Structure formats: structure tokens, C-alpha cells
Design a protein with these regions (language model features):
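Conserved hydrophobic/aromatic pocket- or pore-lining residues that grip, position, or stack substrates
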Residues: 142, 186, 265, 363, ...
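Short beta-strand element of the alpha/beta-hydrolase
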Residues: 410, 418-429
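N-terminal cap/lid segment of alpha/beta-hydrolase-fold proteins
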Residues: 377-418
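Active-site-proximal cap/loop segments of hydrolase catalytic domains
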Residues: 429, 435, 439-655
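Beta-propeller folds
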Residues: 1-388, 403, 438-439, 651, ...
């Protein structure tokens, strides 16, 4: 950095197929890198004739897993996987360029240094692979090696995870990693319920501790599913556990040397954003590991600060002995400001990201004692020509009393009382009860940034946008039993509110969404006449093709066939009587949203005489990245609503 010149450290070929090819060691003098085997040779060529059939077999083992994409499909895929993923873990001295090979060539899921850098936790993927699950579920051999490459200890491996059910966890050791502040200590988890969330047991998990030269020891057991552990430099652990059926989350204070003395700090509904006390603040230590910042009996908490006025992030001090909480900072009510980092041990100086409706996000250093704010960046408005966009936060009510909300955006030059074509954009979410479903999310003071294929581009074409309109599906684990009814009610409430505000008229309001929002769009058009037209991007429309669960639905198709059927707009394609535009990436790798979902939905619509258009984008995934794809998507969306919404003839009224 002093000379601003770059130099080559070593003449090696890095292997970045698995992600980051190099990472810094603690001393900042060495890099841990994954290298290509110099003897690897040219990539294998696909044989002209298949080597044999593709075979899968099951033998009575239950394995209800979700649908995945981009999996290994053929024996040749296995050969390519081995070729590209094989690497040699190596230490490279930055000063001299000297290399130290740490292990033989293999396929490594991770190669993690201990806090001191003297040891490495090695997770190596081994055969047999699977055609059913992604490589993160492949079998692994696990061991610890020293910095000179010598084997220190072999650990229990991870079996192939083809039988882990939806909502469950693997059987055997999982989440193994170095314990913060301990150079020769590992922690890992073991399921006590066989990995089955439906099993009726006293405890779900147990946390284990393993000294490299000793036998494993049980630290504690959790009644709910383990959800995370952070440790302070003084050795105090903060352990979280979560119960999905009740949405209950607990946070425990655990002295790691005396875990029997653990103390419950709080138990709360994870969906209750208003009541969230925050999350313990973590910082990086000299070892490059995260630890909870603790000052005597005090720790720091950060959170979104959700309220009925929107999110106002905060930083608190929390006393572990008294339960007393002291507010150090809270974002103002006329802006949106998030805390990025604490800059000193006493949390007197913090780095924040500040924005308003008129000012784009910039970074500032805040001195909490003096109140002074110092700008670090001065990023300009990326689109000043759109600075006249008007924004207001809107609340309204569904016919069953559930509170709803959205952000109404009006185009530059809008005159009050003018009725515009309106685009309602939404994404449904499930909740356990109506109170938490009605809580406000987001902040109306955020800067409106328009980019990519955002639906906010409609603001440049004379449309109003009813953004992030809430579509809550209330009812806990059985919420989807009334999915369609609640969805239609939420959509109707949005239309009624827009009409009451004097912004829209019932003949020119459209609905749109991406992914689960596309699923929502198709359902609303099938079961309601509230909207004039719709846009559905990268969606799934036939839930029988995701038979082992989706979103928060844990029941399988065979456990709740009527729910899967009634929720699938494909089954109601004959009822879709509003124009629908569908867009999908041909390389969509998102679980459940196979491109065939859009292809079959379009075929069903065409077969019943509906007005529809299907756009399949080559080489695009769940989101679209190529400039050509982004521009084409925007053009299709605007043209569709221009024809079937903005300039559409009034609908006939029948009696």
C-alpha cells in the first residue's frame, strides 16, 4: 500500500472453483490458498457414447427432501466435479513466496485455521456422491492437521445426507468448528431426536466440546433446536435455541467452564419485531475470529428497532447481572440510519450508513459522546432526474381485522387527486398470529434507488407503485389451509385503499411479484377479479412438483394433498381471466422454481384461452444479470402493463 505497486508472490495456479481461493492467516504474513494440481492436465471431454445408464436406488429408507437444481446428473458430471473441485491446500509466505503443502490433493469443503494458526480443521468431501442433493450434503472425512501438514487427529466424519427430512438436521456430529479463544478445542452438535423435528423428545440437541488430546465432553442440552453460539473473550457463551412450530427463540448466558450455571436472558416470539431486544454485538479479535464484546457485566446489543413508525436501528448496553438496558444510540425519525460497525472498545464511536428520502446512502463516523457526525463518503444521487418521486407510508386493514401496510410511491410531477395506473408489488409471508402479522416493516425514509429490473422503473412511465404491500398468511403451521382466502382478502384491501386514497381506480391496478410473489400473482388472478393484469417472474405454480414442502410449509403433499392442490394456481388455470406475463430464467437454480413451472403454467393458460405471454431468458438464473436480459425484462413489463392496464378499456359491468 505504501508504494501502490503490485507484485507476484508465487508462480502458482489458484483454484477458485469452490469460492475464495486464498485467505489471510492471523500473522498477515501468510496466505492459505487452494492450488490447482500442476499435474491436472486438460479438462475431460464428454464421451460420444454414454458409459452406461444413470442409476438411483432406494431401499426402504425415508428421505423426504426438498427439490434441488444444478445437481450432478451423470457419471460424466462426477468426473468434471472431481476435475474442477480438486485442490491442494497450501500456505504461501507473502514475503518470500515459499510454499508449504498442508495436505494432499482432494476436494475440501473447508480448511479452517485454529485461533493461533497452529492447527487446521479439515473437511474433505468423499464418494459416493449423490444425484439427489447438492455437494454441501456429500459425505465428508474430518480431521485436524498441524501447520506443517502432519495429522494431529482424525474425527468422526459426516455421512451422505440424503435422508435429512425437511426441517430436520443430520444425524451425527454437525457444525464442527473451533471454539473462540481456545486453540486446541473444537465444538460440535449432535441431534438427540434423530434429526426429526416431529419426534417427541425432552431435548433436541446437545453441544459437545472436544479437546484435541481428550475425549468429547457434553457441554449442555437444548430443549429446542440449537440456533447459534457466540462467545466473549472472557469465556461467556451466548447460546440461542429456536422452536419452529411455536416460533419461540431463547437466548442463554452460558459460562463455558461451568455450563450448568447457564441463565436464561430472554424468551420471545421470533416474529415479534417490536419486542426484539437485539442481538449481542460481535467484533473481530486478533485471531480473525468473532467474539461477543463484553465490558465487565455489560454487553452491547444491536437491532432493527422495529416500531409502528418503521425501523429505527439502535445500539444498547445490556447488564448481564441486573437485566438493565441502556440506550447508547438510536436512529432519528426523519432518516434511515443503520450501524455498520463499532470503532472502539467502549462503543463511543460507531460507523453508520445514513440516508433520507432525498439523500442517497453515505457512510459516517458518529461520536456518541460529543454527538458529532463526520462524513466518510459523498456518493451522489445516481439518478437526480428522479428526485421528484414522492413517497408515503400507508397502513390499512383487511376484512378480518389484520393490519396491512405498504409504501406508496408517486412519479415526479404527480398532482394530488390525479388517478394513475398502479402497480402493486408484493411477497407473501407466513405468521403465527395476527398481531405480529400486522407489524410495520421497513422505513419510509429510505432513499429510493432504482436499478436492475426493479419494478420501481414503472415510476418513470407514469405509474404509481404500491411497494412491499404486505400479504400475511396467518395461522402458524396450518396457515396455508386458508392461503387463497387470505391472499385474496389482502389483495382486495390493497385495491380498496388505493381507490380510497384517490390515487388509483379499480380498472387500472395491476399485481406483480418475483419467486413466491409470482406464485402469489397467479393465485390472485385465478381466484379474484380485483386486479386488471399481472406480472409473475421466476415463479412456481404447481406445488405437486415440490412435494416435500416449500417456504414455511412443513407438511408433505401426501400429508396435506388438498392444501397443495388448492394453493397451486396451475390447478386453477381455467379461472385466470386477466392477462398474465411470465418471465423465467432458463438456468434458474433456486429450489422449487424449475423453469418447467412457467412452461407448464403457460401451456395450461394457452389451453384454456387465457391472455398470457411467456419470456424464457437463456443463461439466466433466479435473478437476471445480463444487460440484455435486464433491459428486455423491463421492456416486457412496461409494454405488458401499458397495453393491459394503463391503456386498457374499462371492464364491462355485468348484472
Amino acid at each position: 500500500l505504501e508504494t501502490t505497486t503490485a507484485r507476484q508472490i508465487s508462480r502458482v495456479q489458484l483454484n477458485a472453483a469452490r469460492g475464495g481461493a486464498c485467505s489471510w492467516m492471523r500473522d498477515s504474513q501468510q496466505l492459505l490458498c487452494h492450488l490447482v494440481d500442476p499435474r491436472r492436465g486438460r479438462a475431460p471431454e464428454k464421451p460420444m457414447v454414454p458409459s452406461g445408464p444413470i442409476i438411483q436406488e432406494t431401499s426402504g429408507r425415508v428421505g423426504a427432501i426438498r427439490t434441488y437444481q444444478d445437481l450432478l446428473k451423470t457419471p460424466f458430471d462426477v468426473i468434471l466435479y472431481d476435475y474442477y473441485m480438486t485442490s491442494i491446500p497450501t500456505l504461501i509466505d507473502v514475503g518470500s513466496g515459499r510454499t508449504t503443502q498442508l495436505a494432499s490433493r482432494g476436494i475440501y469443503a473447508s480448511f479452517s485455521p485454529s485461533p493461533s494458526g497452529d492447527y487446521f480443521l479439515v473437511r474433505e468431501r468423499v464418494k459416493p456422491y449423490s444425484y439427489l442433493v447438492p455437494d454441501g450434503r456429500f459425505a465428508e472425512e474430518i480431521s485436524v492437521v498441524a501447520a506443517d501438514g502432519d495429522l494431529v487427529r482424525e474425527l468422526p466424519g459426516k455421512p451422505l445426507q440424503e435422508a435429512t427430512i425437511v426441517g430436520g438436521v443430520p444425524v451425527g456430529p454437525r457444525n464442527i468448528g473451533w471454539m473462540t479463544g481456545r486453540d486446541q478445542t473444537l465444538t460440535y452438535l449432535e441431534a438427540l431426536d434423530g434429526g426429526d423435528p416431529n419426534a417427541d423428545v425432552e431435548y433436541r440437541d446437545r453441544l459437545m466440546r472436544l479437546e484435541l488430546a481428550a475425549s468429547p465432553q457434553e457441554v449442555l442440552r437444548t430443549e429446542f433446536r440449537y440456533a447459534g453460539l457466540s462467545i466473549s473473550e472472557s469465556g461467556t457463551g451466548f447460546l440461542s435455541e429456536f422452536d419452529q412450530p411455536t416460533r419461540t427463540r431463547r437466548l442463554w448466558r452460558v459460562p463455558m467452564d461451568d455450563p450448568d450455571a447457564k441463565e436464561l436472558l430472554w424468551e420471545r416470539n421470533s416474529e415479534d419485531r417490536y419486542g426484539d431486544p437485539g442481538t449481542p454485538l460481535t467484533m473481530l479479535n486478533d485471531d480473525g475470529h468473532r467474539f461477543v464484546r463484553q465490558d465487565g457485566d455489560w454487553i452491547f446489543l444491536t437491532g432493527a428497532g422495529a416500531s409502528d413508525q418503521g425501523d429505527r436501528p439502535f445500539l444498547d448496553r445490556f447488564n448481564l447481572e441486573t437485566g438493565e438496558s441502556e440506550r447508547l444510540w438510536r436512529a432519528g425519525s426523519d432518516s434511515y440510519e443503520t450501524m455498520v460497525a463499532v470503532l472502539d472498545d467502549d462503543a463511543n464511536r460507531i460507523l453508520t450508513r445514513y440516508e433520507t428520502r432525498a439523500e442517497p446512502p453515505n457512510f459516517y463516523v458518529r461520536d456518541l459522546e460529543s454527538g458529532q457526525r463526520t462524513a466518510l463518503t459523498d456518493f451522489p444521487d445516481p439518478h437526480p432526474q428522479l428526485s421528484g418521486i414522492q413517497k408515503q407510508f400507508v397502513t390499512y386493514e383487511r376484512d378480518d381485522g389484520v393490519q396491512l401496510s405498504a409504501t406508496l410511491l408517486l412519479p415526479p410531477g404527480y398532482v394530488e387527486g390525479q388517478r394513475l395506473p398502479v402497480v402493486v408489488w408484493a411477497y407473501p409471508r407466513e405468521y403465527s398470529n395476527a398481531d405480529v402479522a400486522g407489524q410495520v416493516r421497513g422505513n419510509p425514509n429510505q432513499f429510493t434507488r432504482i436499478g436492475g429490473y426493479s419494478h420501481l422503473f414503472f415510476l418513470t412511465q407514469g405509474y404509481a407503485v404500491f411497494d412491499a404491500a404486505t400479504m400475511p398468511i396467518v395461522g402458524g403451521n396450518l396457515a396455508n389451509d386458508t392461503y387463497v382466502e387470505q391472499l385474496v382478502a389482502s389483495g382486495q384491501a390493497a385495491v380498496d385503499k388505493l381507490v380510497d386514497l384517490g390515487v388509483g381506480d379499480r380498472d387500472r391496478i395491476g399485481i406483480g411479484g418475483h419467486s413466491y410473489g409470482a406464485f402469489m400473482t397467479a393465485n390472485i388472478l385465478a381466484h379474484s377479479d380485483a386486479f386488471r393484469a399481472g406480472i409473475a417472474r421466476s415463479g412456481a405454480y404447481n406445488r405437486t412438483l415440490t412435494p416435500f414442502g416449500f417456504q414455511n410449509e412443513r407438511r408433505t403433499y401426501w400429508e396435506a394433498p388438498e392444501v397443495y392442490f388448492s394453493m397451486s394456481p396451475f390447478m386453477a388455470a381455467d379461472q385466470v381471466n386477466e392477462p398474465m406475463l411470465m418471465i423465467h430464467g432458463l438456468a434458474d437454480n433456486n429450489s422449487g422454481t424449475f423453469p418447467i413451472q412457467s412452461e407448464r403454467m403457460f401451456a395450461a393458460l394457452e389451453g384454456h384461452g387465457a391472455t398470457a405471454r411467456l419470456i424464457m431468458l437463456e443463461n439466466e438464473s433466479h435473478g437476471y444479470r445480463a444487460r440484455e436480459s435486464v433491459m428486455h425484462t423491463l421492456a416486457e413489463m412496461v409494454e405488458w402493463f401499458d397495453v393491459y392496464l394503463k391503456n386498457a378499456e374499462p371492464r364491462r359491468i355485468t348484472f
